[in-house]
A protein has these predicted regions:
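Helix C-cap/helix->beta junction micro-motif
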Residues: 28, 130, 195-196, 313, ...
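Hydrophobic residues in well-ordered beta-strands that form the structural core
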Residues: 115, 136, 200-202, 362
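Conserved core segment of the aminotransferase class I/II
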Residues: 227-297, 304-310, 405
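Conserved glycine-rich beta-strand-loop-beta hairpin in the small C-terminal domain of fold type I
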Residues: 296-307, 311, 317-336
Length: 414
């Protein structure tokens, strides 16, 4: 039996692998600092879990495009939170934003998928599963791991296959870097995107966890070619509920129809009870606002602590601007690491895990060269329940502090 070559090339997700390694270490009663898996530490607010419990009896198939009251709630929510002007007809709901990303890619018979390196681990495998060419556009520490307009323009102008459609998957705040883009940067990028007719999937799953109030979106500058992807998993702490959505602009209605068709032949619809509960999540702006304020405050505090400690021992790292992640570069230690037989990011993260119990994900999992001594650090190994305790004056994230200390001590002793 011959397996499809794209499926044959597909590997198990690196994030899930590191999570399994962490669990195995913990089962052997060894200390592990789970900085490898970017799952929200915050519990789903009680009002929303009650809505799910009350909807448990809902067993019907819903519209492939999504429950209309949910789509309307999403539109209103993002208008209030981010001043977006959408219509429910242009929203499609799915079982997580991940499957919707794949549905968009699968809608194209042939395309080239552009990814800034580093980017989230699943974008490239999805592009390959859809049968497309995947091209990495490598970024640098000095550019804050961000794609620049001149870089994108230069690549597009020198393409050898200009007839093939371009899809750029663009995530901000970024997983894995924690960095986001300014309005000036997005405006410059939009000029290039329009020039080369690029269809952009703007993955804004972390947008509501931006630490400041000046969050900008590509959609402001390129509404006709920008698909926005988001969902419940990060801001609402409901990753396992698998509820995501996309806004596909009216100018791409033909693509929306195709994506709905792909959805109908794959997951059919998001589960009815989850859609009902999600409607409550998007309708309860009061709950969302207080929850988001507490999350942002705690995440920013932890990010700054981790950044300061790492910088103090010579690690190159930018403080996060949103989300759960830092993307430190350890090139300052390259000579010392080489003496220990460590020359790749994978070797580095394996050594760190074995010698300190700190679980990191190698930069190579995010499209960086294997020789790049980078890693993603997810600073979410703490009790998120505390954000609901109104009596708390000071947040507790001692395990994160301990893990960072272990990593810094290990580096200092190299």
């Amino acid at each position: 039996m011959e397996i499809n070559k794209y499926l044959r090339q597909s590997k198990y997700s690196q994030t899930l692998l590191i999570n399994q390694a962490s669990l195995t270490r913990a089962e052997n009663n060894q200390t592990v600092y789970k900085f490898g898996f970017g799952q929200s530490p915050f519990p789903v607010p009680t009002e929303i879990t009650k809505a799910l419990a009350n909807a448990a009896h809902r067993k019907e198939y819903m519209s492939v495009q999504g429950h209309l009251p949910l789509r309307e709630a999403i539109v209103n929510f993002h208008q209030q939170q981010e001043n977006k002007h959408w219509h429910s007809d242009n929203i499609i709901v799915g079982s997580g934003s991940k499957i919707l990303l794949f549905c968009v890619m699968a809608a194209f018979e042939q395309a080239e998928v552009l990814l800034p390196a580093p980017s989230w681990v699943s974008y490239a495998p999805q592009g390959k599963l859809a049968g497309h060419k995947v091209t990495w556009l490598t970024t640098s520490f000095n550019e804050k791991w961000q794609l620049t307009a001149p870089q994108l323009d230069e690549y597009c102008q020198n393409r050898t296959t200009p007839e093939i459609p371009l899809i750029l998957v663009f995530n901000y705040p970024s997983n894995p870097t924690g960095q986001t883009y300014s309005a000036k940067q997005l405006s410059a990028l939009a000029v290039v995107m329009k020039k080369h007719n690029i269809i952009v999937i703007a993955d804004e799953i972390y947008s509501l966890l931006t630490f400041t109030n000046d969050y900008s979106t590509l959609e402001q500058f390129y509404p006709e070619g920008c698909i926005v992807s988001s969902g419940l998993s990060k801001w609402c702490g409901a990753g396992g509920w698998r509820l995501g959505f996309m806004h596909i602009p009216p100018q791409l209605n033909h693509l929306l129809n195709t994506v709905v068709g792909v959805a109908s032949e794959t997951y059919s619809c998001a589960p009815a009870p989850i859609q009902i509960a999600a409607t409550t999540a998007y309708e309860r702006l009061d709950v969302a606002n207080s929850f988001l304020t507490a999350q942002r405050k705690l995440l920013n505090e932890i990010s700054l602590h981790c950044t300061t400690q790492l910088q103090n021992v010579g690690v190159m790292v930018h403080p996060a601007q949103g989300g759960f992640y830092l993307f430190p570069e350890f090139s300052a230690f390259s000579e010392k690491l080489t003496k220990h037989g460590i020359n790749t990011s994978e070797q580095f993260t394996l050594a760190v895990m074995e010698e300190t119990g700190v679980a990191l994900l190698p930069g190579s999992a995010f499209g960086m060269e294997e020789s790049s001594l980078t890693a993603r650090l997810a600073f979410v190994d703490f009790d998120g329940e505390q954000v609901f305790d109104e009596q708390i004056n000071e947040y507790n994230f001692e395990k994160v502090k301990d893990g960072i200390t272990q990593l810094c001590v290990w580096l200092a002793k190299l």
